[in-house]
Amino acid sequence: ELLMARSPHVKAIREYAAAMGIEKPRFTRGNDKCILCGLCVHVCSEYVGAHAITFSGRGAEKFVCAPLYRSATDCIACGACVAVCPAQCITMEDVTDAKTYVPGGAEEVGSARLVHNWNVRFPWKQCKSCGKPFPPPSPIELMEQGKPLPKDFFAICDNCRK
């Protein structure tokens, strides 16, 4: 019932509440999509090893964020948090025209992976073989392969690797 009050628009929560006979919660909390399951925090720290996100606050004020409320500088933009989130509230996109503003008024434009929730802009690498920019591979795909990776795995795009 408390999850339903916190995240009434999350489909998985509505279905679970209906199965439990809860149509409308007695409490009102807000409209936060995050259900605080902790899967994103767990996969980031235990499986990926980046420790880029954590819980902050206590009780009703608890939420997931980057440490010290800043950009998640340890984030490798792998997408593991996006993949495990049952509420689908973590957003990530690959863009070719990402802009970063630096002190002094300069602007850097290029291809990058953006993780909106953690305020991360992860620049794509240039392929050593063909020179084209490519996004970082997903650690989930790497774990599924279950075999040692070649030394230049992260320096060559998928097309040149085939």
Annotated model-derived regions:
Residues 1-75, 82-84, 88-140, 153-162:
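Ferredoxin-type iron-sulfur electron-transfer modules and their immediate structural context
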Residues 146-147:
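Short proline/glycine-enriched turn/loop segments at secondary-structure junctions
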